[in-house]
């Protein structure tokens, strides 16, 4: 609710609150289904040791009877540029305080998407990440501290999530994180650190495609964006 005011990302797909589900009529559910779940809005991805003719046979057997419907054009209002900081403080009886900082970032096909992904890895991937070394190991101010991207199709979020140790206020925790971000922005990344994180990404992408299920899902994912051939060029974007 803080990051998005217009775009549907402001609430979960299933609804903003439980009452939305409770108030849904069966006609509303059917209308949603028949609008979005159509052959025109589908991608069939197959990764298996099968002849193409056999794939056609099975595809026709299981899917040809599905009725085609009107094409749906996805048209969502873009989120306006955020010009001021938004804050929300929640008080609850919990074991540890938690701090979340979110920055708007590029969409999944944008030029800066992979830059943000790489930055999140440099900051917090494993015990060689800057956050771990500086704010958990050397100067233990956090129990946990991570940076990650949401991976959204439209303009997404770069998120930093941390749990400060007892005695470290949320304000102090925020200042420590901002100091690390300012330092990151003011200095060039060393070639060794940069290459190490690129290698980790390349390894993850490679191992990710070892199973047929992951291959099929990735092929469909890239076809959704542009072309399934994008699966072969993803690492080059880093």
Can you describe what each PLM-predicted range is?
Residues 1-19, 41-47, 97-107, 133-238:
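M16 family metallopeptidases and their MPP-like homologs
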Residues 5-6, 10, 38-39, 43-107, ...:
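An aromatic/glycine/proline-enriched structural segment found at the starts
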Residues 24-26:
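Peptidyl-prolyl cis-trans isomerase
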Residues 33:
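Conserved, carboxylate-rich catalytic/transport cores that coordinate ions
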Residues 52-56, 111, 168-172:
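Short, conserved charged micro-motifs
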Residues 63, 123-127, 178-186:
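Short amphipathic alpha-helical signal-transduction/dimerization elements
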Residues 101, 111-123, 131-133:
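Active/ligand-binding-proximal structured segments within catalytic/core domains
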